[in-house]
Swiss-Prot record:
One term under GO cellular component: ribonucleoprotein complex
InterPro entries: KOW (IPR005824), Rib_uL2_dom2 (IPR014722), Ribosomal_uL24 (IPR003256), Ribosomal_uL24_CS (IPR005825), Ribosomal_uL24_KOW (IPR041988), Translation_prot_SH3-like_sf (IPR008991)
Name listed for the protein in its UniProt record: Large ribosomal subunit protein uL24
Signal sequence residues: none
GO biological process assignments: translation
Family: Belongs to the universal ribosomal protein uL24 family.
HAMAP family the record matches: Ribosomal_uL24_B
Annotated keywords: Ribonucleoprotein, Ribosomal protein, RNA-binding, rRNA-binding
Coiled-coil regions listed: none
Subunit architecture: Part of the 50S ribosomal subunit.
Length: 101
């Protein structure tokens, strides 16, 4: 499914335990409509040892967030994204203030 967000966009989290935080989109799962935001929605994961010499360990990892719970964040404003054509090119812009992204 098409999304208006791209990898590398700064987003603000709207819901959940990290509400109000901002971060960069690391990856997008277009099939399940989830995004992974850098340093947000952290969970602990147990990694088992692969060999008898290694030890099992607990790592912190970013968990996916539903795409409806994030909004593009630019110049201190969180806004929805729109598209407009300028010089036969499709451009993204913030709907709140009309700024190009």
């Amino acid at each position: 499914m098409k999304t208006k967000l791209k990898v590398g966009d700064n987003v603000k989290i709207l819901c959940g335990k990290d509400r109000g935080k901002t971060g960069e989109v690391v990856s997008i799962d277009r099939k399940n409509l989830k995004v992974i935001v850098k340093s947000c929605n952290m969970v602990k994961k147990v990694v088992k040892a692969r060999t008898p010499q290694e030890k099992s360990k607990i790592i912190d990892k970013e968990a996916p967030i539903d795409i409806s719970n994030v909004m593009l964040f630019s110049s201190g404003i969180a806004s929805r994204i729109g598209f407009k054509f300028e010089n036969n090119e499709k451009k993204r812009y913030l709907k709140k203030n009309g700024e190009n992204v």
